[in-house]
A protein has these predicted regions:
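Short amphipathic alpha-helix adjacent to the substrate-entry channel of hydrolases
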Residues: 32, 50-69
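N-terminal cap/lid segment of alpha/beta-hydrolase-fold proteins
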Residues: 1-33, 159, 163
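Conserved serine/cysteine hydrolase catalytic core
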Residues: 183-192
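Primarily recognizes the serine-hydrolase "nucleophile elbow" in alpha/beta-hydrolase
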Residues: 92-163, 179
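Short beta-to-alpha linker loops that shape the active-site pocket of alpha/beta-hydrolase fold enzymes
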Residues: 25, 44, 67, 72-76, ...
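Catalytic nucleophile-loop/oxyanion-hole region of alpha/beta-hydrolase
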Residues: 49-51, 70-105
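Short beta-strand/loop motif that positions the catalytic acidic residue
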Residues: 191, 196-199
Length: 199
């Protein structure tokens, strides 16, 4: 297994923000040319990132034959869209290195638990918007997620919201307009990839 750490920060990122990759070593004796890659976003209410939803989960995906990566994204005091842009940078990085890493570029999946599920789903609904590609100065095609795994995700900012997550995510942007924008069940569109959702 090849393990590396990559800088995926933007100007509002926290110092610890990074992507850790867990790539299955390529072997001529194994007939698999490329593998899917899962980018994991641990939960933590946008207050911290939970280690129990990081490496242990990544290793389970590796054991099942997937490449994996963990995004240790920026949380409070960082606000929307800092973590979203870090996830976009991570998808861009994986797709740019797909040939070298033996990743199937059409099977890059974002996964998230709890608030990390909100981040993964946010990426699923916002990846094609101009503010993402313009900020990274890349084409939208390279940012496209091919699927989502949403593990007990925070989704709604409405009646059943996990208020702490939205307080931490929005902080001084905590307005009705931004609550509506980040209530992801209201943002589903034709660009959203297929999702596996479990609770």
């Amino acid at each position: 297994m090849i393990c590396e750490t990559f800088d995926i920060k933007n100007e509002n990122s926290q110092e610890y923000a990074r992507l850790n990759t867990y790539l299955i070593s390529h072997s001529d004796s194994i007939k698999t040319e490329t593998r899917p890659l899962i980018i994991l976003c641990p939960g933590g209410g946008y207050w911290f990132t939970s280690e129990r939803e990081g490496e242990m989960l990544a290793l389970q995906f590796v054991a099942a034959g997937f490449h994996a990566a963990i995004l240790w994204y920026s949380v409070k005091p960082a606000t929307f869209p800092t973590a979203l842009l870090e996830l976009a940078k991570s998808v861009e990085l994986v797709r740019k290195h797909a040939k070298e890493w033996y990743v199937d570029p059409d099977k890059i999946v974002v996964e998230g638990c709890s608030a990390g599920g909100h981040l993964a789903a946010s990426y699923g609904v916002f990846w094609h918007e101009d503010f993402v590609s313009n900020k990274l100065q890349v084409s939208k095609d390279i940012l496209k997620p091919n699927g989502m795994i949403l593990s007990y995700p925070v989704i709604t900012s409405g009646e059943f919201a996990h208020r702490g997550s939205f307080n931490n995510l929005l902080r001084d942007q905590y307005t009705e307009e931004m609550l509506e924008k980040t209530s992801l069940e209201k943002q589903v569109n034709e660009y959203v990839p297929r999702a596996f959702i479990w609770h």
